[in-house]
Amino acid sequence: MGFRKRNAKRSDNRSSAKVIMGKPASQLSKEEKKILSARMAEIRSENGGKNTVQNTIPFLCMYQDGVCQVSENFFSLTVQFYDANYSISEFDEQNNIFSKYCDVINLFDNTIKFQLTFENQNRSKAKLVKTVQIPEQDDDFNSIRKEYSEMLTDKLLKGSNGQSARKFLTFGIESTSYKAARAKLMSIKNDVIKGFKAFGVEAELLDGRQRLEALYYALNPYRNSPFLFDWDEMLRAGMDTKDFICPPSLKFNKADFEIGNAYGAVWGMNILAGELPDEILKDFLEMQNLFCVNIHVDPLDQIDALKFVKKKLTNVEQMKIDEQKKASQSGYDPDILPPAIKMYIEDIEKLLGDLNSKNERLFHISISLRAYAKSKKELKLLSEMLKRTCQKNNCIMFPYDYRQEQTLVSTLPLGYNEIPVRREMHTSGIAIFVPFTTKELFQDGQATYYGINTLSGNMIRANRSRLKNPNGLILGTPGAGKSFSVKREILDCFLTTVDDIIICDPEGEYFPLVSALHGQLIRIASNSEQHINPMDIAIDDYMFSNPMEVIANKSDFLISLCEIIVGGRYGLSAEERSVIDKCVQRIYKHFIENEPTEDKMPLLSDLQRELHEEGEVALRVANSLEMFVNGSQNLFNHRTNIDMSNRIICFDIKELGNQLKKVGMLIVQDTVWNRVSANREKKKITRYYIDEFHLLLKEEQTAKYSAEIWKRFRKWGGVPTGITQNVKDLLSSQEVENIFDNSDFVYMLNQAAGDRDILAEKLHISKEQMKYVTNSGPGEGLIRYDKVLLPFTDKFPQDTQMYRLMTTRPADLA
């Protein structure tokens, strides 16, 4: 794909990259410039001041938009694509993924050559570790931060996050100019990305810098220095793009080569069997070495392909006739053919039928394997491992003697090919190198730890705030680890963010953790001295934001509260709802007009008094409030007397009776609304955790109010999380069912049989995937983050201060 003379003269610096000209403004720091300068000095020293290493890299020009001019008339683009959950999908879904992947391969006609590159590359461990390290702060929690950082680092290094299996699809065309090539390549790129998107695979175009970065890591194994590059710096220093990506040195031997401080080799691979297992590529990439599988593909015109196959069939038929003649002359039965000829005829006839009637095309392909090692001995051991893997999959590996330079550069994602050995293969044959196993979820920057990917062993790390709907559900049977998972997320967020955290705790489970974090524990009970006022509003939000919305929300809440208090089969009448709304409007109008302060906040008794003044229509509601105003349950007829400014607040409602517990949980939710309202002005996130969430979903009024939170919280900077063992309660009404639709984060631990069926239907989870929440151990299950679904395992170290703060197991607390 594209040609050049070996050892061609190095291209002029000004033509090696096309840059949008302007005032140079380097993006590299002084320290990075020092590192780059040292690297260039090393390259000059290793090569005697000549550019021999740069000349090995076979392209003429890299454009900022990602178009690469490989040779005078050949241009290419590279798309990086990501993983899909192939391994844990059911057979039908695997077939769908396979079929759609075939569609992507069939996008390319005989004018477009393409290259599939699957490469294990090292990620900087120091950089990775830095992402999970929590900086110390001037507070009392640095010992916990240190312990948590050490735990995360340990889990990170035990996994394979230090390596990334990158997947590139490079395609190229012949063209007389960059402008004409770009237009066609960008059109092809759009079709390719759309093709991947059709089966849920993310794909993105690599721009010029990203392509250079991919080349840098392919050519610099085991180097700790990161890729450093800047277009303006290149112009200022009079450098070439190849100066930024080439290895310090290259020395080619008969069957291997030395590259910088490492050793490498490229081998060819021939397929012996008619069919291959779909895990062949997975077997190679799971070897945890710096390893690359490369497939160059040259599509045939469909008419030429049919002619080619028919000619092959004619030749084999002639072989058959010749064999029959020999058998007849020797006195044998002419119908008895050698098995190889019989099988060959069957294969060609099947291929001809597939080309005529199925979604199959024919291609010339060449397959190569590239590996790096730190020593020759290690490289030899690696080659033996590769041979065994090839044999296991009915393939044979062979060396490219005296062609290591040509084959090395052919493994780079450029669309350039000097690999001599090639064979014919149809669409399904190429697609059987299935590049999909399991999706990964590891976000850089501020993110929360959620366990280890059961399939890959990699850490799961994500930031819910980045989701369109950060609302979440944590679901599981008793003993599955719900409370522990919630506390782990709370602890992580407390240590790594500035978010406010509020917990509704119906079972009194969160006290040890909240106390250790110096949080505010609010005990709501008939005999408690701590009070929260259900008539509270956020005064600043009213005065400076949206007063009508504040009062409308408060009215909606108080109507729901009165409906629970009044009870009965039919709840409040339309007239009663209207009169409550009227009274609420009047109460807060008077409050606002008379220098509003916290110590003048209205009480439930004010609402009762206003209702009495409305006469007969409001009498039933006013009388129902009596017990909560002057009776035994008047704990909510007091002004708030607790510090609500603490960053972490836990409402302990364990001692409330069942009916009062619903009232308490609803009042807590309204208090959270007030906090979210106040924080919205500060652009601060408020996380709200509701344990025993099913208690709120059983009553129409509290269920409706909860559904409203799930619909509106995100706009105000709220992140609610419902925790429950009763999944069926989430289907109690269409309104409540919408909670599922408005939750882009679902953390599923072990599930009861009936709940598994509900989750499978609502979240479109396959039977194969549901195995991970069937009789699973504590801390094991499935996580859904937007469209990503992964099995996870969280074996939290028990010999830590953190574990003792979070566990609820009686054996651990004894």
Predicted feature residues:
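Extended, folded cores of ATP/NTP-driven motor/assembly subunits in large transport
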Residues: 1-438
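P-loop NTPase motor domains
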Residues: 84, 91-109, 117, 121, ...
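Hydrophobic anchor at the beta1->P-loop junction of P-loop NTPases
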Residues: 474
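Conserved lysine of the Walker
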Residues: 482
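Hydrophobic positions on the alpha1 helix immediately C-terminal to the Walker A/P-loop
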Residues: 485
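Post-Walker A helix-loop "phosphate-sensing" segment adjacent to the P-loop in P-loop NTPases
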Residues: 492-502
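A short helix-turn-beta junction within AAA+ P-loop NTPase domains corresponding to the substrate/partner-engaging
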Residues: 518-522, 735-748
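Conserved P-loop NTPase
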Residues: 763-814
